């Protein structure tokens, strides 16, 4: 049963480690706890915030509402046919560690998620952000999810089309933001798995390891090594991973920028557009390694903003806006934050 805790501190529940508090919080350890918490008379009419690992949120203030702390455990494996192909289905509770799930599936001989290793957070948050890394996104491995529909007052199952996935985007960041609370997610991992190593940085890492025909474990190990070199451990330095999305532009914009900036880093997309490396642009503007009081830009990866303790989310967002404005002034491209800002 979900009990509401008043005046609940959230410092331990966000990876930036910013201090904030919720009017009420409920530890959700089973699907039915969602409905119980939401129908508690004390929560009636209050805004609701769902928190998993807190790795994709910036808390700039106290939250005057109900926070659902998602802790639903459990992993189940099965088989199914999806679009005419055989898949392993892996259903995980929203509170399961994302990296823990990836490590478990790879170790159990269920490849498909290895490119997404070491991304912080929980399973329930993964489809909201359509997390992605090294050439693979959640949408590529998604089967369905079960969520509580706050409008209907019941649990529903949503497939990939329902979720309307986009680049670091989904239904749950738009029209469904205040409607659905994800309880569990089912992934479809191909039985006829083939390694996805087209991402240049991953290919270089595998080549450096003299691995020409990688197994899923090889890709997992390579991704973990790359991420550990580039990204700070949230347990040591407050951060939310990549803070800015890589902007997507049309071919004409990319060509015009390339003429002015020959070193521009960009990646062709299937629809003919280009995804530009926001980290490269931030670095070119001189922000990499810059510290502004207790917040700053990580010295090994310009996409990452950090909080070294004792600072505030307001300071962080001031720095973020300065970076956005400077990049826009120089390149004419607007970069947008990945985390949700409260």
Curated annotation (Swiss-Prot):
GO process terms (BP): cell division; cell wall organization; peptidoglycan biosynthetic process; regulation of cell shape
InterPro entries: FAD-bd_PCMH, FAD-bd_PCMH-like_sf, FAD-bd_PCMH_sub1, FAD-bd_PCMH_sub2, MurB, MurB_C, MurB_C_sf, Oxid_FAD_bind_N
EC number, UniProt record: 1.3.1.98
Keywords: Cell cycle, Cell division, Cell shape, Cell wall biogenesis/degradation, Cytoplasm, FAD, Flavoprotein, NADP, Oxidoreductase, Peptidoglycan synthesis
Cofactor: FAD
Any coiled-coil regions, as ranges: none
Residues at the active site: 168, 242 (proton donor), 338
Name of protein: UDP-N-acetylenolpyruvoylglucosamine reductase
